[in-house]
Amino acid sequence: MSTLHHRLTITDLAALKGRQKIAALTAYSTPIARLIDPLVDFILVGDSTAMVAYGRPSTLAMRLDETISHTRAVVDCTRHACVIADMPFGSYQASPEQAFRNCAQVLSETGCDAVKLESNRALAPTVAFLVERGIPVMAHVGLMPQFVHVMGGYKAQGLTEASAETIVEDARANLAAGAFSLLLEGVAEPLARRISQQSQQPCIGIGASPACDGQILVTEDLLGLGGPQQPRFVKQYADLTAVIGEACARYASEVRQGEFPELAHCYGS
């Protein structure tokens, strides 16, 4: 973990490649962001907000105004971690100009440090357009949830020669376009290892390889708040579902039995 003297930048993240693994998590709200801020190198305000915070069926339902609201909340309560906003589906695919307009709005209204785009070769020119105009971009390749209907579901990528070649070409195109980092999701381990070793920019894995330059998980998943069915790549470090359930059950029981509040919890008593 890096020092707490300043908010980390994309330059700081790049400098960690080959020196120290990058630890990253998601956050959508002040309580979680404040807790993880001193512990991680960057926080992703993911489009997974749509599912985790709002209970929607997929990330496709995330809206731009929600991205701005949640990212601003995370930026306002953190001081250390680099904050990256995940651009929602439909906010950047139509044209480079649309992408710049929406990404610029996110950066200017939230104070975040960079944006993340799910980007294949076809969108690499958009990445270049953004970088040339001052917007740092992390490119997400491999399993891209915003492409779920095209990909036929949430399936691991790079398991066949053709799929692996597609991912390699997507990665190369985005790095050549100026992406400061790659996020490799659901990519076959040998392929993710090779891309990470060959890339001069940090490669962050989620369901990819321990050889990646860093790792990211959805915070609620590692805390046991993500529901009973989790992807293979999730490691649960705590079971807060049980802890929270027990605490709330005790509260409800004490209220119904007249045990809470006690006079110690009241004013003027």
From Swiss-Prot:
Q: Which InterPro entries match?
A: Pantoate_hydroxy_MeTrfase (IPR003700), Pyrv/PenolPyrv_kinase-like_dom (IPR015813), Pyrv_kinase-like_dom_sf (IPR040442)
Instruction: Tell me what this protein is called.
Output: 3-methyl-2-oxobutanoate hydroxymethyltransferase 1
Keyword Nucleotide-binding among UniProt keywords: no
Q: Which NCBIfam families match?
A: panB (TIGR00222), PRK00311.1 (NF001452)
- Cofactor binding note of this UniProt entry: Binds 1 Mg(2+) ion per subunit.
Q: Does the keyword Magnesium apply?
A: yes
- Names of the cofactor(s): Mg(2+)
In what pathway does it function?
Cofactor biosynthesis; (R)-pantothenate biosynthesis; (R)-pantoate from 3-methyl-2-oxobutanoate: step 1/2
GO cellular component terms listed in the entry, alphabetical order: cytoplasm
As for family, the record states: Belongs to the PanB family.
* Subunit structure, as described in the record: Homodecamer; pentamer of dimers.
Gene symbol? Answer: panB1
Q: What class of enzyme is it?
A: transferase
Role of this protein: Catalyzes the reversible reaction in which hydroxymethyl group from 5,10-methylenetetrahydrofolate is transferred onto alpha-ketoisovalerate to form ketopantoate.
Classification via Gene3D superfamilies:
Phosphoenolpyruvate-binding domains
Any one GO molecular function term: 3-methyl-2-oxobutanoate hydroxymethyltransferase activity
The residues that hold 3-methyl-2-oxobutanoate are 47-48, 86, 116
Species in which this protein is naturally found: Pseudomonas entomophila (strain L48)
